[in-house]
Amino acid sequence: MLDKSRLRIAMQKSGRLSEDSQELLARCGIKINLQQQRLIAFAENMPIDILRVRDDDIPGLVMDGVVDLGIIGENVLEEELLSRRAQGENPRYFTLRRLDFGTCHLSLAAPLDYNYTGVECLQNARIATSYPHLLKRYLDQKKILFKSCLLNGSVEVAPRAGLADAICDLVSTGATLEANGLREVEIIYRSKACLIQRDGEMPADKQQLIEKLLTRIQGVIQARESKYIMLHAPSAKLEEVIALLPGAERPTILPLVGDQNRVAMHMVSSETLFWETMEKLKALGASSILVLPIEKMME
């Protein structure tokens, strides 16, 4: 039995979001021994339990109050939400924040030889999908009548097997579509991973732990999106150099021994530093330019 006084977090056991979810928790300082076959893991240094389940079970576990938090793809969350509403339920939960992984989109795809000129071409078509409610919402908005063929896997083989005229499936790179003689024709939903919380009263100690976790997640994401920049620059060009490196705060400026015309500059830049930016810095007289990753960050 799970101890209800501990924070319960559901995450995908295996699949697209599993490794990224594990890495996020680890970088937040949560020490968990995640053995391959164990469905429940206990944090060693915080009152947190991890439930490792199928991704399509996570929204229901949160909405039904079985767990406190869930890490889930927005596509799976939205499909479950629409499914429950279709059954007359009023599911409740909170989205605490989007995360910086799990990027994908749900798309309509058709065979390469399908004469597709617009979504109107799918009028009365048979479409295979694992996301019938998201598909229905999109095509209802377009006033397109269609027949749904529900498949829980290998959706991309449906046209070749004669089960459907087209498909609606998740796309990350498009390689799977291409391998099955399909092409993407419409994007109907864009998705990332998100962190959700159950509705209802939360004990104060749990809520404090959630706030601490959110602060750490923010720090992890900021660190991933930021770089620590060190360089030498002409004193007369400081503002021009700073303009090329947008950051959270003003840079640290240090004098260079034996050089009155140049300074050392240290700063955190909130944007990816491209080669073109470094070339512009060089053109302004900057030198010894170092771009370093940041492991942790808290403003």
Swiss-Prot record:
Keyword Magnesium: yes
Keywords attached to this entry: Amino-acid biosynthesis, ATP-binding, Cytoplasm, Glycosyltransferase, Histidine biosynthesis, Magnesium, Metal-binding, Nucleotide-binding, Transferase
Localization per record: Cytoplasm
EC number, as in UniProt: 2.4.2.17
Cited PROSITE patterns: ATP_P_PHORIBOSYLTR (PS01316)
GO biological process: L-histidine biosynthetic process
Designated gene of the protein: hisG
Record flagged with keyword Zinc: no
Predominant location category: cytoplasm
Cited function: Catalyzes the condensation of ATP and 5-phosphoribose 1-diphosphate to form N'-(5'-phosphoribosyl)-ATP (PR-ATP). Has a crucial role in the pathway because the rate of histidine biosynthesis seems to be controlled primarily by regulation of HisG enzymatic activity.
Transmembrane segments: none
Recorded family membership: Belongs to the ATP phosphoribosyltransferase family. Long subfamily.
Essential cofactor(s): Mg(2+)
Enzyme class: transferase
Catalytic activity: 1-(5-phospho-beta-D-ribosyl)-ATP + diphosphate = 5-phospho-alpha-D-ribose 1-diphosphate + ATP
Alphabetical list of SUPFAM superfamilies matching this protein: GlnB-like, Periplasmic binding protein-like II
Oligomer and partners: Equilibrium between an active dimeric form, an inactive hexameric form and higher aggregates. Interconversion between the various forms is largely reversible and is influenced by the natural substrates and inhibitors of the enzyme.
Regulation: Feedback inhibited by histidine.
GO CC term, one of those recorded: cytoplasm
Pathways per UniProt: Amino-acid biosynthesis; L-histidine biosynthesis; L-histidine from 5-phospho-alpha-D-ribose 1-diphosphate: step 1/9
Molecular-function GO term, any one: magnesium ion binding
Protein name: ATP phosphoribosyltransferase
